[in-house]
Regions:
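Secondary-structure transition/turn motif
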Residues: 81, 102, 132, 261-267, ...
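Feature responds to low-complexity, polar/acidic, surface-exposed segments characteristic
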Residues: 247-254, 263-288, 300-316, 322-349, ...
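Short Lys/Arg-enriched alpha/beta "domain-start" segment
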Residues: 43, 48-85
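Proteolytic cleavage junctions
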Residues: 1-21, 32, 38-39, 46-50, ...
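Proteolytic processing hotspots in large secreted/extracellular or virion-associated proteins
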Residues: 69-240
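C-terminal, surface-exposed recognition/capping segments
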Residues: 233-234, 416-422
Length: 463
């Protein structure tokens, strides 16, 4: 797969860290400066009666502005500050403000000011933008208006900052990049790509929020006539043509099929068909998980259509698979461990896993990427991923000793891995090497990795 980093064909396998649980941390939703947006044309209308749904109740609180930008038509719905504040006052937390937009424009924009976003954040409210091709569900706290305010300068009033949440068709140039990526990656685009973005505009300065601290949901409508059984996943396509899987489910919503996508970043998304079957997994116990993860671009084969399911996994391979499975964007290749060089194929992957708190390495500052991954090491890393997906907080409070008491070799689990092992067992991601053994020191095979990553995503409700 030309646009997806592949795992090296070697017999080295994995081990996890002697980890002190550093906890998960994401890249944050801080704004990234970008070039100022092209000026909009004068509005063709200013309809003050666009309905906005507040917890399902319709209130005329939006004004529609039609414009053009870079040869694309734009419909902007500007939310009335006074009416939004009136709706928020006295309401309980977790309100959902829905903006249904009926428009054929290339770009759909919901526009609020920074103070409105701050008021919504204080109420833990969620903003939902609906168009005929996609829906974007954005918790107000993920805009991170405080970080945006700091970047623009604290002298700038929140009232004067425009927050623009967009659902857009890609530009002609970006569409060409996407089509080329599909050809190079041997997958078929099932629906037209959609770009999701969040921008903060103040004067001539535009900041773009590219990263979130929790998974943010968006849906893409599957057109009539498309077989939902011939969809394997949604993907993100970057401006340089690189592609990554993002966790995706196919659901029926209001009588139509939708791809429900959860991601920690904004970008251009599409839905693809990429069936994958590995010949040496045809009769393997993990066949379904292996082929599913392969079809989703999470795992790749070794050579000649083989997966070598019973080969042990290296630490670098495990890091790659969990980063891909979670849909994390790899950024930067500055080594964070003494034994990882910027020229190594796994350099940016390991840096990303470290940045998200998934791995911490050894006390001597090494990661030992070509050593084999043990089961207890893998359980520790997966438990950290559970924090990122929100699964950890759903577990009932129970001691590790009680959780693991049914395994006769529970005492063999290292002290640093005890809580991680208990969390993964309690969540149902790890069920034991046998009915009553964990075998924590055993190496983890490629088949086992495919199975546990699939379980992590399924039990977290992401696929």
């Amino acid at each position: 797969n030309a646009v997806i980093p592949t795992e090296p064909d070697n017999d080295d396998v994995v081990d996890p860290p002697n980890d002190n649980d550093s906890g998960s941390q994401s890249g944050g939703s801080g704004g990234t400066p970008s070039a100022p947006a092209a000026p909009q044309t004068a509005p063709e209308n200013g309809d003050p009666c666009i309905p906005i749904l507040f917890n399902g109740k319709s209130v005329n609180a939006g004004t529609a502005v039609e414009s053009t930008r870079n040869d694309q038509t734009v419909t902007t719905i500007v939310i009335d500050s006074e009416k939004l504040n009136d709706m928020l006052v006295g309401e309980s937390e977790l309100a959902v403000i829905t903006i249904p937009v009926v428009s054929t424009a290339d770009v759909i924009v919901a526009e609020l000011n920074g103070q409105q976003v701050k008021n919504m954040e204080d109420k833990q409210s969620v903003l939902e933008i609906q168009s005929d091709r996609a829906t974007y569900t954005l918790p107000a706290e993920q805009v991170n208006i405080s970080a945006i305010s700091q970047q623009l300068g604290e002298s700038v009033s929140l009232q004067d900052i425009k927050i623009q949440i967009e659902i857009a068709a890609p530009t002609t140039d970006m569409l060409s990049i996407i089509e080329n990526a599909a050809e190079q990656g041997s997958f078929a685009l099932v629906v037209p790509p959609v770009e999701f973005s969040v921008k903060a505009v103040y004067g001539d300065t535009t900041l773009e929020a590219t990263h979130f601290t929790a998974y943010v949901e968006r849906t893409i409508v599957i057109p009539d006539g498309v077989d939902p059984a011939k969809i394997t996943t949604a993907i993100v396509v970057e401006p340089d043509g690189t592609v990554r899987h993002v966790p995706t489910q196919i659901k029926v919503i209001d009588g139509k099929y939708h791809a429900v996508i959860n991601s920690l970043t904004n970008s251009v998304y599409s839905v693809i068909w990429h069936p994958q079957e590995f010949s040496d997994a045809a009769s393997h116990w993990a066949k379904d998980a292996i082929n599913d993860m392969g079809s989703r671009l999470v795992i790749s084969g070794t050579e000649d259509g083989l997966f070598t399911p019973d080969r042990d996994t290296t630490r670098a391979e495990f890091a790659a698979i969990i980063v891909r499975g979670l849909g994390l964007k790899t950024e930067g290749d500055s080594p964070v461990f003494a034994d990882v060089q910027s020229t190594d194929w796994y350099s940016s992957i390991i840096a990303t896993a470290h940045a998200y708190g998934l791995i911490s390495g050894y006390e001597d500052g090494t990661f030992r990427p070509n050593e084999k991954m043990t089961r207890e090491q893998a359980m520790t890393i997966i438990a950290r991923a559970m924090k990122l997906t929100g699964l950890k907080e759903q577990l009932p409070d129970q001691s590790a000793d009680i959780t693991l008491q049914s395994f006769r070799d529970a005492s063999a689990v290292s002290a640093w891995a005890l809580n991680g092992a208990a969390d993964t067992v309690q969540a149902g991601i790890i069920s034991g090497k046998s009915a009553n053994t964990l075998d924590p020191k055993a190496n983890m095979t490629r088949a086992e990795v495919a199975a546990v990553i699939q379980r992590l995503l399924k039990i977290s409700g992401l696929i």
